[in-house]
From Swiss-Prot:
Record organism: Shigella dysenteriae serotype 1 (strain Sd197)
Name used for this protein in its record: Sulfurtransferase TusE
A molecular-function term among this protein's GO annotations: sulfur carrier activity
UniProt feature coiled coil, ranges: none
Complex formation: Interacts with the TusBCD complex. Interacts with MnmA.
Active-site residues from the entry: C108 (cysteine persulfide intermediate)
Length: 109
C-alpha cells in the first residue's frame, strides 16, 4: 500500500497498483522514486507508450512484445533491449508497467 496525497493506494506485494484507475502522472513519479528512477522525457515516452498499449490490447506487454512494439513506433534506436534496460535496469516491462500503474506483465517472473 502507498499513501499518496493523503489517500491509501492499494498495491500488490510487489508494488503494482491494484486499481489502474487510481494512477496519475504525479503518482507515477512517486512509484518511480520507489524504484530508484528519476523520470526523464525518455522514461515518460516509454511509460505513456505502455499505458497506450494496455488500453489498446488490454494487456501489459512482456519484454519481447515491448521491444517489438517500441521498434515499430519509434524505430530500432529506441526499440531495443539495451535502450530499455538503460532506462529501467530492473526490467523494462516490469518497471515501466509498474510506473504506468498497470498490472504486472503475465510472462514476467
Amino acid at each position: 500500500m502507498l499513501i499518496f496525497e493523503g489517500k491509501e493506494i492499494e498495491t500488490d506485494t510487489e508494488g503494482y497498483l491494484k486499481e489502474s484507475s487510481q494512477w496519475s502522472e504525479s503518482l507515477a513519479v512517486v512509484i518511480a522514486e520507489n524504484e530508484g528512477i528519476s523520470l526523464s522525457p525518455e522514461h515518460w515516452e516509454v511509460v505513456r507508450f505502455v499505458r497506450d498499449f494496455y488500453l489498446e490490447f488490454n494487456t501489459s506487454p512482456a519484454i519481447r512484445m515491448l521491444v517489438k512494439a517500441m521498434a515499430n513506433k519509434f524505430g530500432e534506436e529506441k526499440g531495443n533491449s539495451r535502450y530499455l534496460y538503460r532506462l529501467f535496469p530492473k526490467g523494462p516491462a516490469k518497471q515501466a508497467t509498474k510506473i504506468a500503474g498497470l498490472p504486472k506483465p503475465v510472462k514476467c517472473i
